Design a protein with these regions (language model features):
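Broad hydrophobic/π-residue packing in well-ordered secondary structure
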Residues: 9, 30, 39-40, 60-61, ...
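Short glycine-/small-residue-rich flexible loop motifs, especially phosphate/cofactor-binding loops
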Residues: 6, 51, 88
Length: 116
C-alpha cells in the first residue's frame, strides 16, 4: 500500500511518504479493533478518535486517516480510496510526510494513518 501511495503522490509532484512505526501501530490496532468489534468508523465505539489513537502511540502531529473494509488486496483498497474525493485528498496532500498502514484479513479492515 505504501508503494502505491507513493506512486500516486509522485504522479502529482508530492514527495514520498515514509513509514512511521507509531502510525503503523495505531493503524494496525484500529484495523484489529474494527474487525473484532465489527464496525467501520474513524471513531471507536468508546469514543476514541483517530487523532487520539495516533497521539497515544507517541506521534505528535496526526494529519488524517483513511479506512476501508471488504477489499482483499492493496490494489483494490487503493483504487477505492483514489475514487473517493476525501480519501484521495488525504493521499495526495503534499504536506503529509509519514504514513502507517494496518490491515486485518478477518473482513479485510484497512487503516491508513498519516502524519506531518
Amino acid at each position: 500500500v505504501v508503494d502505491l501511495v507513493n506512486d500516486e503522490r509522485a504522479d502529482v509532484g508530492c514527495a514520498a511518504v515514509t513509514v512511521d512505526s507509531r502510525l503503523a501501530r495505531a493503524a494496525q490496532r484500529h484495523s484489529d479493533d474494527m474487525a473484532e468489534r465489527e464496525y467501520l468508523s474513524h471513531t471507536s465505539p468508546d469514543g476514541t478518535t483517530f487523532d487520539e489513537r495516533i497521539r497515544d502511540e507517541g506521534h505528535p502531529r496526526p494529519a488524517a486517516e483513511n479506512i476501508a473494509m471488504g477489499l482483499s488486496s492493496p490494489e483494490a483498497v487503493m483504487d477505492a480510496w483514489m475514487s473517493s474525493d476525501g480519501h484521495r485528498r488525504n493521499i495526495l496532500n503534499c504536506d503529509i510526510t509519514t504514513i502507517g498502514v494496518g490491515v486485518n484479513s478477518d473482513g479485510w479492515y484497512w487503516t491508513q494513518n498519516f502524519g506531518y
